[in-house]
Structures are given as structure tokens and as C-alpha cells.
């Protein structure tokens, strides 16, 4: 798999790159924190297929996993390493190993579609879970499940494929911070600028790595153009 090029910051106006739909207008609320948009032709191609309404659930799951692999590689670019020595068949040479344990926390249920990618790249990763439900009238989330490992001195990867209003992502981050997390990176497939702005306002230290910042939200708080309900398409519960 080709290594991803450095991601772009979402602090400046975004352009359409490699077929990926990103924000090209001035939204009412623009992200102001640390947000990186993955800039890779494979990511753009995978995202295009995920957006396609005719993509069936089995293929959707495969595409989501592949895109999550790229997102995870970018999200862990700055994980600290430590020097070590390794013996090759010919000699001894220097290398590195990860110096900070990783924890993956998918937001149920949609985040499960990104989890396998993380566990394949990092088999030693510890996994926690956060369950949130959104009230479709107020769009506000409620926490119904939380099972978290120790989070202090660990790099936490929060898996939330589609932060829309930012309420669920903020609630998840709040739960993680209350459990001791101080190094959180949110991985998402598509994001709304309103949601990212709210997340950075309430949790300015959280970094976001996404494949696209879309145009915004419609009157039902759905991301436009988006890709529909990620969890429903992932599990075939349309």
C-alpha cells in the first residue's frame, strides 16, 4: 500500500483534490483547531466509492476498512518512538519501536467499521468502547455505554466516522478525558465543519484526521454531500 502524503490542514479554504468532495465555500462555522484532511489519491477513490449509494454493505465494509488504514497511518505519524537494536541475519543494526501505548475507542456502532484497520496495523492495541445515542429531535447525544481501559499516558484513537454537529464527538471526548486521556486523535471518514468547530471549541487539544470536510449540515443535521448513515450502510440496516 502506498504511504500517504502529508495531510493538509483544514485551517485554510479546502479544494477538491483527486475527486474527493471537500469544502470549497466559506461555511458559517469554520474549523479553527488542528484538523488534517488526508491528501492521497487512494483515499479519494475509496471515499468516492463509499459515497456511492449503490455500494452494497459487504463492499462498503471493505472500503471503510481500507480508508481507515490510511487514516490510522496518518493519525499515528507523530506517535513517539524509542531507539532499539535488532539483529539481522548479517549484523546488528539500530531501529525504533513505539514508545507510547495505543488505545482505540470506537463510538458504537458506526466506529466498529474502522476498528479492524487499527488492530491490523497495531495488534497490541488496547480497545475500549463508547456508546452514544442521538436524540433525533434535539440532535443531542446521551451516553448509554462506556467500557474503557486505563487511558493515562496513552495515545487514544477515537473512531467516529461522521462527526456532524460535533455533539457526539464532544461527548465521547469528555468521557475519555474524565477517564484520564490527555492525548486524543479523532479519526473520521467525512466531517461537517460545524461539528469540527464545536469539537475544537470544547476540546481544543483534540486532533482530527479526516478524509473530507464536507459542505455542511442540512436541516436534519445530516452531513452534505456525506454518504448516508454510516452504521446503517455498514451493517445493512437501511
Question: What are these language model-derived features?
Answer:
Residues 2-238:
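PRPP-associated nucleotide enzymes
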Amino acid at each position: 500500500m502506498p504511504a500517504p502524503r502529508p495531510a493538509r490542514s483544514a485551517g485554510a479554504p479546502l479544494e477538491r483534490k483527486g475527486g474527493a468532495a471537500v469544502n470549497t465555500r466559506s461555511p458559517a462555522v469554520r474549523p479553527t483547531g488542528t484538523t488534517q484532511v488526508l491528501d492521497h489519491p487512494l483515499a479519494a477513490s475509496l471515499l468516492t466509492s463509499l459515497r456511492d449509494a449503490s455500494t452494497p454493505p459487504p463492499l462498503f465494509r471493505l472500503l471503510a476498512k481500507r480508508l481507515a488504514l490510511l487514516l490510522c497511518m496518518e493519525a499515528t505519524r507523530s506517535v513517539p518512538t524509542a531507539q532499539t537494536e535488532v539483529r539481522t541475519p548479517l549484523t546488528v543494526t539500530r531501529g525504533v519501536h513505539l514508545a507510547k501505548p495505543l488505545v482505540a475507542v470506537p463510538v458504537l456502532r458506526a466506529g466498529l467499521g474502522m476498528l479492524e484497520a487499527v488492530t491490523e496495523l497495531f495488534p497490541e492495541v488496547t480497545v475500549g468502547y463508547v456508546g452514544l445515542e442521538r436524540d433525533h429531535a434535539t440532535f443531542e447525544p446521551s451516553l448509554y455505554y462506556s467500557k474503557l481501559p486505563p487511558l493515562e499516558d496513552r495515545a487514544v484513537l477515537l473512531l467516529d466516522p461522521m462527526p456532524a454537529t460535533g455533539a457526539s464527538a464532544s461527548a465521547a471526548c469528555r468521557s475519555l478525558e474524565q477517564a484520564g486521556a490527555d492525548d486524543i486523535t479523532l479519526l473520521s471518514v467525512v466531517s461537517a465543519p460545524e461539528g469540527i468547530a464545536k469539537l475544537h471549541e470544547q476540546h481544543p487539544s483534540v486532533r482530527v484526521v479526516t478524509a473530507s470536510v464536507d459542505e455542511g449540515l442540512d436541516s436534519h443535521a445530516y452531513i452534505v454531500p456525506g454518504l448516508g448513515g454510516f452504521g446503517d450502510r455498514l451493517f445493512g440496516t437501511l
